[in-house]
Amino acid sequence: MNKFLKWAVLPTMILGLFTVTSCSSDDDDSGQKNVTMKVGDTYTIKSGSNWSVDNEYVAEITGSTIKATLVGEATVSNGTSSFKLTVDPKTILWKDPYMKWNASKSQVKTAMSKYELLTENDDQLIYNGKDKADYYGYQFQNGKLYSSMVFTSYLEDEFNDFLKERFILIGSNDETLTIYFTDYSMKYIVIAMFTEIEDVPYCIVGYGDASEVNSMAQTMKSEFINLKPYIAESIKNGDIKVGNANVREVKAKILETLK
């Protein structure tokens, strides 16, 4: 199945923009074994036949062999038996931002209590990041969370793997240097927006409800403008590595590996 082409059924609003190495199991209520895998791993079902999976993005089944292909959850069944399949990522660059849409600002602050709050206004929270996340950003409408963002200068091959393990490619826009994704459940949209500061290619990864895709893109641009002085200062201080790559080349390379 061509998973990219299958997205022709997406709403026009979105399209217009653009051998197991580790496996665990536990019993569910029906006595079946639930399975947890990592992307790229395989697992052989010990008994039964005619197995199928209800989400072909998360896993593929050939005979009795499951291959995990995308982070998410699915149900594997053969008409008489079933079990839950959970696929976890292999590549972890940062902790996922808080993504409970419509949460209050106080709820986000509680969830981010271990991170340093950098700046705050009525519609926005920005935190210093950890690991490969330089910053986290949260945007609010009428006091409710509608978009979460991660700002990163880490655009090595691992970044490609990070995206590919978690998200389904929808499309891209060369003019705005953006790549659009969704998750396995198709409940939220992910936008990778590329830019350049002090000759350093930079990316903002924005997460939000699929219905907010248009306003998300504008919000990401706004948050980037607010953070630009902090990012530039980090580059001058040597906290962010300076590279020679052109941002358009970086974006094109990442997009090619995702197809």
Where are these regions (language model features)?
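Coil-to-beta-strand transition motifs
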Residues: N142-S147, M186, E196-V200
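Short Gly/Thr-rich strand-loop-strand
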Residues: E165-I189
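Short, hydrophobic/proline-enriched secondary-structure or compact coil segments at domain edges
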Residues: D199-S215
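Short helix/turn-capping signatures at newly exposed starts of structured segments
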Residues: S25-T42, I61, T69-V71, S77-I170, ...
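Short, exposed beta-strand-loop hairpins at the edges of beta-sheets
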Residues: S77, A192-E198
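Bacterial Sec-dependent N-terminal signal peptides
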Residues: M1-T42
